[in-house]
């Protein structure tokens, strides 16, 4: 099996220290390719995107004129449904009559990483977790770094508007981000106003999670991802059970052990379950997850571009709005919502649908690099002389707009970006194509009416 090596920077690598043997210093080794966080499907801690070497600094000769953030919540515990599956497996381990041998020998003195069931679906914090990847702490750091870079846009003694879905963990992330951004000036209702937007279908298009209102998307399902060969799971089950006769471990259980590895890292900083699999098995499982997400939340689903048009159109309108006194737009939602937005935007869209009969190398759609825990999309509006430009930073890496990257810092002129958006979603009618109830709001307005309308949906898990 792969021994997950820990480096000084707490990187978790699917390789041994031999990767350094033929180079003079560790700095010469390309170890990022082995980082286990690449292979855990976005369930594990945040990981920066592998970019193109383009500096994320504001380009010389330009000023930042507006910044938009669309962020996923931070690292969390497994959901209640995930937790139920993991507990069922743990019950099998606890009820096993015998001493565990082989790769599972650690189970002889192992304790389940979720000590309190009320933590399911919650964001990890220093209070409820033991590791270094607390979601609240990472959100705090993110907010502070964001202020350091874009603080010139923030008007002192003003009220910072923040837009968050009414998921408890999403709201929690937004709060800690705001604390990091505002520091000692943080005061709810005075220096920051949280606009809590319902995730329910009845808010229609006036939502950070418009997928809820798209009834036709709920009717749509793709069986494409199910064609992927998962016989490797049988081999894992056989390998683990062989020295432990009588243990009933199904392929579904094995698949869930990959998630166990990821979520335990969120809570404890590491997991012995990560050592159960080979390098190839991590890659195979990761691609299976990429397929599932691509054909449900990505461009493989014909409705995602339609749903994503709601946020993308609003983003474009904000970029064009020069009269608004606020130029710092902070929005928080879920991985599904960010992935759907990406489907509309198209920067990370593969040239062809993902194949199910083989793993393409390089893989053009790695879910963990698109929406890891704490994922973030920055939309920068740059003012360079008399011209305005748009640039995207996705998970801390500049991702140029296809065929529109000749501006400073590989940005795209705002007028050209508007044409790009029209080409992507100009033919979309969210209300009609999604079958949205005619009594629901037909457009997103909260970015413009939040000062006069109260958005305070009750928090839910």
Curated annotation (Swiss-Prot):
The active site is at residue 73. One of its GO terms (cellular component) is fungal-type cell wall. It is found in: Secreted. Pfam families: His_Phos_2. One of its GO terms (molecular function) is acid phosphatase activity. Disulfide bonds join 62-384, 261-274, 404-412. Induction: Expression is regulated by the HAP43 transcription factor. 1D-myo-inositol hexakisphosphate binds at residues 72-73, 76, 79, 169, 293, 334-335. Disruption phenotype: Leads to decreased phytase activity, reduced ability to form hyphae, attenuated in vitro adhesion, and reduced ability to penetrate human epithelium. InterPro entries: Acid_Pase_AS, His_Pase_clade-2, His_PPase_superfam, Histidine_acid_Pase_euk. GO terms for biological process: hyphal growth. CDD domains: HP_HAP_like. Keywords: Disulfide bond, Glycoprotein, Hydrolase, Secreted, Virulence. Glycans are attached at residues 97, 157, 229, 248, 302, 313, 437, 452. PANTHER family: ACID PHOSPHATASE PHO11-RELATED, MULTIPLE INOSITOL POLYPHOSPHATE PHOSPHATASE-RELATED. Catalyzes the phosphate monoester hydrolysis of phytic acid (myo-inositol hexakisphosphate), which results in the stepwise formation of myo-inositol pentakis-, tetrakis-, tris-, bis-, and monophosphates, as well as the liberation of inorganic phosphate. Myo-inositol 2-monophosphate is the end product. Responsible of about 25% of the phytase activity. The residual phytase activity might be contributed by other cytosolic or cellular enzymes such as acid phosphatase that also degraded the substrate phytate. Is essential for human tissue damage during infection. Monomer. This is Phytase PHO112. It comes from Candida albicans (strain SC5314 / ATCC MYA-2876) (Yeast). The gene is PHO112.
């Amino acid at each position: 099996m792969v021994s997950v090596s820990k480096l000084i920077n707490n990187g978790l690598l699917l390789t041994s220290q031999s990767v350094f043997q033929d180079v003079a210093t560790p700095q010469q080794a390309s170890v990022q390719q082995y980082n286990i966080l690449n292979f855990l499907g976005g369930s594990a801690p945040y990981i920066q995107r592998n970019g193109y070497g383009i500096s994320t600094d504001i380009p010389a000769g330009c000023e930042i004129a507006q910044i938009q953030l669309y962020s996923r919540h931070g690292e969390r515990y497994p959901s209640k449904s995930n937790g139920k599956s993991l507990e069922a497996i743990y019950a099998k381990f606890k009820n096993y009559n015998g001493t565990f041998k082989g790769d599972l020998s650690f189970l002889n003195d192992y304790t389940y990483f979720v000590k309190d069931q009320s933590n399911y679906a919650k964001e990890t914090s220093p209070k409820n977790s033991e590791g270094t990847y607390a979601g609240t702490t990472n959100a705090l750091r993110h907010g502070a770094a964001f202020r350091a870079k874009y603080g010139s846009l923030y008007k002192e003694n003003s009220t910072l508007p923040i837009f968050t879905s009414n998921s408890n963990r999403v709201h929690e992330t937004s709060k800690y981000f705001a604390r990091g951004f505002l520091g000692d000036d943080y005061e709810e209702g005075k220096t920051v106003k949280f606009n809590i937007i319902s995730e329910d279908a009845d808010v229609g298009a006036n939502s950070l999670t418009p997928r809820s209102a798209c009834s036709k998307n709920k009717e749509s399902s793709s069986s494409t991802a199910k064609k992927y060969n998962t016989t490797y799971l049988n081999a894992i089950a056989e390998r683990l059970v062989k020295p432990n006769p009588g243990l009933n471990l199904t392929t579904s259980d094995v698949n869930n052990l990959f998630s166990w590895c990821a979520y335990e890292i969120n809570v404890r900083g590491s997991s012995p379950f990560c050592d159960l699999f080979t390098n190839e098995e991590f890659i195979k499982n990761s691609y299976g997850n990429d397929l599932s997400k691509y054909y449900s939340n990505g461009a493989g689903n014909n409705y995602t571009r339609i749903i994503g048009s709601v946020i993308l159109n609003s983003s474009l309108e904000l970029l064009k709005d020069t009269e608004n006194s606020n130029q710092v737009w902070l929005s928080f939602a879920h991985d599904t919502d960010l992935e759907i937005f990406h489907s509309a935007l198209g920067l990370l869209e593969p040239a062809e649908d993902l194949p199910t009969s083989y793993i393409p190398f390089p893989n053009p759609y790695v879910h963990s690099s698109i929406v890891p825990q704490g994922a973030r999309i920055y939309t920068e509006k740059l003012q360079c002389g008399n011209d305005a430009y748009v640039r995207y930073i996705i998970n801390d890496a500049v991702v140029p707009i296809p065929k529109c990257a000749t501006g400073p810092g590989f940005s795209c002129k705002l007028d050209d970006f508007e044409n790009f958006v029209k080409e992507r979603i100009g033919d979309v009618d969210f209300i009609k194509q999604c079958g949205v109830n005619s009594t629901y709001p037909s457009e997103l307005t909260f970015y413009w009416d939040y000062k006069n309308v109260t958005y305070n949906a009750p928090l839910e898990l």
